């Protein structure tokens, strides 16, 4: 960046930019934020704005681009969304009063993890993560700068760190140590995170817990330091750090949550089709965020689960009160975000009016809960502090139609401040006086068209056309001459104008001062507002669970101290909602205390994966406090859920690999306990048949002998069903089918015992392969079954005359047949065969 012969203003820009080399610098110049040099070139392309230049006639004109200050937020959002940082340099003095260059300073650095004022309001958390390391120990801290939530935990390896970051869906990580090349590769490239470094620790420890382990303390303090360094202000809304252990909740890694579609549908990436979509009948932004958090972290504490269940039951038993409650919750705004705007000094009159509206709804919400007369609700009622003095202050002070801009006036209610009312009286009377002067001078002068107008340059003036200039009174003095008219003033008009201008200026200044005092007063209530937000959010989530329990016909699950699973006529709640209750076929899942493994066999696309997911989904719902889809449900409390459910029902995606299978299997057998739930679907399909079968059997045996976790193991290796005779805690189940008149119907019902057939050819028929091809495959299958051989039969000799195209006849005339002829189908897994069939079908 060339700096020779720069103007003082540009030199100021260069000096500031040196301090923030990794950020776009938005440099306030009047009504615009300007960008220069490379920032301008890059921003013009990213934001699709015009690229111009400063000093166009110079030998080396400086690239320049700009955005209006009043609409800058939408441009900042675009930059942040794409992973950039933005430094905001404001004018720190009035340019009209500045001597020399206007003083400018960076007042905030906005990063993907510190967005607090997006033009796209969202009910999701935006977590900023910090990690530090001490030997083999990792400290991971995270906070949401909007809600003020602040947490920390200790982890034993980098894989767990990455898993937690994925679970939080963080976009930015603050690093307190130097990453290895491999770690940087994972965080930056594989996880696409914005990486920021912070070596300093925050000195004010009032938000920290001195009992934390050293590495947890440093991760927390460096996160605080980074936040204060970028935000450059007091952050009174940040809550004291809360330490947690991942083992305090039902543990699920990112892959498990994705495969179960807990918070978003894995295929679409959208909310619809997820458990979150099913359970979300919340009415507030805080409630929606809390529900998402509950889904991410179901409980393992039976007492806390039952406490939630009991509130859901109360709401189910009080339909009309619950209906009133949901109506009242609709009047509640996002208190946490409003509190953060107060802390950041960005509150406008609209924010305060929303806060007052919310506070005015709280007594009604509290009264509804108290009216149910249930001791179960006492802890919720205690959190509903209406803060009446704050609601009274805002309602008395802020005008209902107040503008959003705090310098425009019209913010403060009449009657709130006596001095302000006097200024407003002068303005009102001044307007009347001007009307009286206009009428008096029109009558005295005889100029029928005489009128008083106003503009910023000339102030108030009499407008006289050229044809009437001869009638202008002697006490008029000329203020401006136009082509067809002239403007005049009088001493009386000037005096009134002076009084009005003084009153208007003093009124605006006083209103601003009053508003700032009110905003400061509101800031004293931030902690109480945050506690209220938590209480309302909890009420909102629990009423949402009650609504869903009623509309989706859910029942209250029971938890036993044993490991028995007994779910009668259970359903996959999300699939059922998508399909419709009339078409969904329920399944009973029963595993006695001495049964640890169900080995599931049956055709592809018959419902094995749905059956497995059904159990996991039911467990998650139960442990977050929700009711579950079944006629009855008795469950243990699981400490973790592990899944390897790949793309068995999503063949075209082709994302799973044998290595991923083995890594996820290893994760399960390394961390599962007897209190865990393991779901393995088609494990071993990504390698040769005997390799896959050997691995599948050894994994089953290991779980059976060394872990004892409740396990659903779906497999296409029918040979494994013989394990039931040697493993006393394993039972076979299968998906039932109905064969009638040569047609096969999948009943989607789980029944005891192993499957007797795989029905692979029938699945191929469903996939739409040609009838001649299927007929040939069926003939080969019959021949194999009769021979009892594991080798393919010899290919038929081609015939000069054939009535129909057979599987291998005349391959030279059909490229698909040629490809099929090359396949060693007897050393391929059913999954591999299905993938090939799908690809060939697409070529037809």
From Swiss-Prot:
Keywords: ATP-binding, DNA damage, DNA repair, DNA-binding, Nucleotide-binding. SMART domains: MUTSac, MUTSd. CDD domains: ABC_MutS1 (cd03284). One of its GO terms (cellular component) is cytosol. ATP binds at residues 602-609. GO terms for molecular function: ATP binding; ATP-dependent DNA damage sensor activity; damaged DNA binding; mismatched DNA binding. One of its GO terms (biological process) is mismatch repair. Belongs to the DNA mismatch repair MutS family. This protein is involved in the repair of mismatches in DNA. It is possible that it carries out the mismatch recognition step. This protein has a weak ATPase activity. HAMAP family: MutS. This is DNA mismatch repair protein MutS.
